[in-house]
Amino acid sequence: MRMKKRKLLLLGVVCAALYACSTDQTNESGKRVSALDDAAWNHSEWISVANAPVITGEINGSNERAADGAAWFVSVVRNEKEITSARWMTTGLGVYELYVNGKLIGEEILKPGFTHPYKTKRSFTYEVSNALSKQAGAENVFAVQVTPGWWADKIITYSGQQGMVGAKVAFRGVLELTYADGSKAYLGSNTSDWKAGIAGPVKHAAIFDGEEYDARELPGYDTLDKLSTPEKNTEFEGEILPSNGGEVYFREDLALSPQKAYLWKGVTGESEDAYGKVVITKEYAAGEEMVVHPGETLVVDFGQNCAAVPAFEFMAKEGTQLNCRPSEILNDGNGAKSRGMDGPEGSCHRLNLRTPDTGMLLDYTFADHKDYTTYRPHRTFYGYRFVSITADQEVRIRSIQSIPVSSITQQMETGSITTGNKLVNQLISNTLWGQRSNYLSVPTDCPQRNERLGWTADTQVFAETGTFFANTADFFHKWMRDMRDTQSPTGAYPGVAPLAQYGASPTDMNRLGWSDAGVIVPWVVWKQFGDTQIIDENWAAMEKYLNHINETKYDHHALSAENGNYQWADWLSYEPLESCSGRHTAKDGSGTLPETYDYWNYLSANYWLIDAGMMSDMARATGRDAEKYEAMAAQAKQYILDKFLNADGEFKTAIFNTMQTPALFALKNKLVEGVAKENMMKRLRDNFAEHGNCLQTGFLGTSILMPTLTENGMSDIAYELLFQRKNPSWLYSVDNGATTIWERWNSYMLDKGMGPQGMNSFNHYAYGCVCEWMWETMAGISADTSEPGFKRIIMKPIPDKRLEFVNAEYNSAAGIIKSSWKYEGDQWIWDFAIPEGAVALVTLPGESQAHQYRAGSYQIVK
């Protein structure tokens, strides 16, 4: 059906409901429904604000901010007939929000989400009839606000590249009206029936920049005089797909209240080498109203680091400006500059955000409210535990909360695991909060600094852990589309997906351990959920990738045009040859060490072997050629044996024999056996002893550390590493007050202060991969690839008395699985439950023989 022209009515639009509604209300109208047929898009076009401000010139450096202002698009429609239903299919170039008659539509935020900016946009369709006046002749106001996030901001812009330069935000939508007589009409965005302009209270908003909000301004649907004819936007020529995974929500169920709050004014102990210590003038009790005056700073501690936004209920005179600055950590040690502090002890530390003065801001200007008003940012997010609040006139804060933001909803969460050890429980909590914070439209690395990208190694090392805590199948279907969109013509996968400010350039491809996420993630989703659709969707892309690395033997030099002659490798490890620290290069400045190239080629060959084995599994599950990949895996294994290992289990590159990660990959991939294996295991045990029972591994080595030790009879070492509290270890961060997983083992050190500020996140989930081992070894719940999706469960708990007990419950694809054990004296008591339709292969501690159990609840005493 062709769209019937509708005249925009600009005069006489006076609706009390419009003026009563704030653009930051949280009670939504509109239920999300299935998308209209693709053909419906033919009734619409992309529209932008004519002469809208854009970023010009070349982007260099990290401080470039998005263009100011929010674009509003408004159409007023008179009903030709009585309406019975209305579906509105929408998408945007930039973060957009929908309003019908002043009512905010939908509970999803940050729409349309983070995708490849030029290849894919996601659409959201809502049933909006409840927000309409339905009678014939009634008028309804459809309005959209769009800000630069995901499209015209720094997150997608390479230094010196186009990206946000010249980009205009845009909207596209189709409204399907069904009338009482059964007929339908389609009304689409166009340049004749819509008005557009830069208007409203949002003065600036972007993913990295934060949000500036002036409550004195009315929303765009109330200021039609500021709007004019839009222009057609032709910047996006990609595909629009219905959103089905990766949507972002406020987690109201996890709302955080202040655990501590205080005012400070002035500093003592300041010197040339130290910022000193804040002078606290008042501490607030829980629930007490907080008052901030000019010259004072209010610090609020919510007790939990996470991706979130502050939500205020506050009051001040018209024109008062409040500035809120989030941070992950406080300055300490009298603000000693030698400790990396950026302010006095007790103040919020923001240097690790990398743009502390120009990014991650929240500025609010008060309107002439006679009473308390509410506000929270909707068009950005922050990563923080603390906020620092100042104001230029008195502000009274009746309530402030931190509202977590995530793609993991309460309904998606599937697993809980607790022990009798408080430190281990905190580590589990830190991991879960890291997942909630970083599964945000894409699996990001961190939510706080000017990065927030879909780093592919972070994703693959944590993927299996994440499947226990939440049903991530749809989330990863969406992200694997981002991976395919960003895949190179040769088949190489990127360092980040989707395309972003860095990590996905033509020389950031085929980075070992990163590129392999293109195979590892679909394999994990298939194994954990029994999902073969993800294999089918990605098979051609995975096959192209495997053919490419097989032809080149994943050799670093052969792929140097794609990898930029650099590898991240076992990122942030404490071992020799680590890349970030520069230990991979010669001390005389002559460049990369020959041993480093050997290391990179050894690791990449191991991933070639891993990838081929996973492809064989997935081929067999979907009726494809598994033998091809079995042969490829055998070829990769022989290549590693010939090139890197001696017959006695020693590495040909001598320095490998002093490291943990090379041995772990050799053991994981069964490269050694017999005496050679015994020799390697002895060297590995000795290595741990030499390092005081501390791990030395980075992102890649840590991901295989605990399972590999356990599979090779070294669960005693695995438990020593779990309980270790020295640096580096998991519990070192717990002892230092962490509430999420850190990027570095030493992101903060009690004796030395902050880690390197140029790259120092306190909310990185990668090292939370230890929880995969907790689920599969401590609790003894793992999937069997012979019958994926937990139809066949491997239950092989390995207990340790220091835990006292473990209680684990997992709502798997096959149903609820339970495993709980405890010690009573020397007696070990294990209760476990298997869901209907599933079977379990049960192996008791200290035994090797597995016994099959069918659905039911059981207790074993040993």
Q: In which residue ranges do the predicted regions lie?
A:
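C-terminal motif of bacterial Sec signal peptides marking the signal peptidase cleavage site
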Residues: 19-20
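Active-site acid/base region of carbohydrate-active enzymes
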Residues: 95, 189-198, 394-430, 436-437, ...
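Extracellular/oxidizing-compartment recognition motifs
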Residues: 25-449, 474-475, 497-499, 533, ...
